[in-house]
Amino acid sequence: MFQGAMVAIVTPFKAGQVDEETFRNLIEFQIANGTHGIVPCGTTGESATLSFNEHERVIEIAVEQVDKRVPVIAGTGSNNTEEAIRLTKHAKNAGADGALLISPYYNKPTQEGLYRHYEKIAKAVDIPLVPYNIPGRTAVNMEPDTIARLAKIDNIVAIKEAAGSMKQITDIIARCGDELVVLSGEDFLTFPLLCVGGKGVISVVSNIAPADMANLCNLFLGGDFDAARKLYYRLLPLCHGLFYETNPAPVKAALAMMNKIPSDELRLPLAPMSPANRLRLRQDLQAYGLI
């Protein structure tokens, strides 16, 4: 169920509120272009600045609009284990197919603390779980040995790995084998990860180029490695351009330039892109043929 290119979808806002109509339209754009899954309320979805009610509503909208056409993996992570359990229970009750849980941030747990955090959530909620390792945002790297321990838990089925290290990725796959699906959390590592046994990506770039990101995974998983490699190198400027500034400012700017969202409205403390980087991004989109 969890393989291919799954979009870490943005949460559009209008006058400070979740723009439900635009969000539904974005989901339809994704499914029409072959995206393999929808991942709402992640980093790209600005989960950190959604209220609990908004967070739950965005998941409900996603499940309703997708209507079982592709899997929905709902972001339900928190640095408070009990809050993560509450959000994950809601995702299950709403009909999500799985839950994506960022590692606890700010409180800097030990490896044992990380293990117990995910273990408790797994025991509390019977839904497929995808831990999310992104030490650049959490300040703690979940080490391969810890991930291998978590892979023994029945409903921990995959990991979104975004430590930026191919060594770590290969260590995880070597330790876990078929017990755990490894997904890239970084678009620019999608092809290298597939080459060492990973199964896909939870993608920011899929917001703006869903068909090509899905095709990259389809080609590779179908055995056409050379075509996949060529497409990867074509996508690479977008993989870099969407991170000229803190995600999701660039991807929202790109979607606005493409007329997929009415504006690139963000919630503080995130700010719009600088004019210089906005120009660079526009040039990338023009070169790719997206605008």
From Swiss-Prot:
SMART domains: DHDPS. It catalyses: L-aspartate 4-semialdehyde + pyruvate = (2S,4S)-4-hydroxy-2,3,4,5-tetrahydrodipicolinate + H2O + H(+). PROSITE patterns: DHDPS_1, DHDPS_2. The active site is at Y132 (proton donor/acceptor), K160 (schiff-base intermediate with substrate). The keyword Lyase applies. InterPro entries: Aldolase_TIM (IPR013785), DapA (IPR005263), DapA-like (IPR002220), Schiff_base-form_aldolases_AS (IPR020625), Schiff_base-form_aldolases_CS (IPR020624). It comes from the Bacteria. It is an enzyme of class 4 (lyase). GO terms for biological process: diaminopimelate biosynthetic process; lysine biosynthetic process via diaminopimelate. CDD domains: DHDPS (cd00950). PANTHER family: 4-HYDROXY-2-OXOGLUTARATE ALDOLASE, MITOCHONDRIAL, DIHYDRODIPICOLINATE SYNTHASE. Homotetramer; dimer of dimers. Catalyzes the condensation of (S)-aspartate-beta-semialdehyde [(S)-ASA] and pyruvate to 4-hydroxy-tetrahydrodipicolinate (HTPA). This is 4-hydroxy-tetrahydrodipicolinate synthase. It comes from Syntrophobacter fumaroxidans (strain DSM 10017 / MPOB).
